A protein has these predicted regions:
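Glycine-rich phosphate-binding "P-loop"
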Residues: 16-26, 68
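Substrate-recognition element of Asp-dependent hydrolases with the DxDx(T/V) motif
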Residues: 24-25, 38-63
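Non-catalytic pre-domain segments flanking phosphatase-related domains
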Residues: 1-19, 156
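C-terminal cap/substrate-recognition subdomain and adjoining C-terminal extension
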Residues: 59-156
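Short, acidic loop-to-helix structural element flanking the phosphoryl-transfer center
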Residues: 6, 28-46, 79-80
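Catalytic phosphate/metal-binding cores of nucleic-acid and nucleotide-processing enzymes, i.e., regions
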Residues: 12, 41, 69
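Catalytic beta/alpha-barrel core
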Residues: 28, 50-51, 70-75
Length: 156
């Protein structure tokens, strides 16, 4: 668990981390450099779930290699499926990280939604549905590894 107190907002407790796969932690079906090391550190602190529509068919393989849980969403209303996952975990203790339009509801439902703008870009709708926006996944994960950075960003 990660606990932080943000001046002007209050105390937050993060127990779950939901990560979108393609475009967020993977590019062209490959995990981005630096991600495995950071997830290794975070696995000691939070429950990590990799959520994917499995566009490239490698979700299970990549999740296994990272030793995280996999949650596959079916074609259709992917936003609603991701939202349901966050609600099941408990939005009040879940951090979500994503870059696509189908991540919007999960970002809004989570206590902390982090928008990653990567080489794949980020949808306009997704960019306006965040608490924090960062240039890449490693910066996003570092915010959880070093939560004092979040305090500086989110304080009121």
């Amino acid at each position: 668990m990660i606990e932080i107190t943000i001046p002007g907002i209050g105390q937050h407790r993060f127990e779950h981390l939901v990560l979108d796969l393609n475009g967020t932690i993977a590019l062209d079906g490959n995990i981005m450099e630096g991600v495995p090391v950071r997830l290794e550190l975070l696995r000691e602190l939070v429950d990590i779930v990799l959520v994917t529509a499995d566009t490239r068919g490698r979700g299970q393989e990549l999740g296994n290699s990272l030793r995280v849980k996999i949650h596959k969403v079916d074609p259709g209303d992917e936003q609603a499926q991701k939202l349901k996952l966050v609600r099941q975990l408990g939005g009040g203790t879940t951090v979500s990280i994503g870059n696509g339009s189908n991540d919007v509801y999960m970002l809004k439902e989570s206590i902390l939604g982090i928008r990653v703008v990567s080489a794949e870009g980020a949808s306009y709708e997704a960019v306006t549905s965040w608490d924090v926006i960062v240039p890449d996944i490693n910066v996003a994960l570092d915010l959880l590894i070093k939560p004092e950075r979040l305090i500086a960003t989110l304080r009121k």
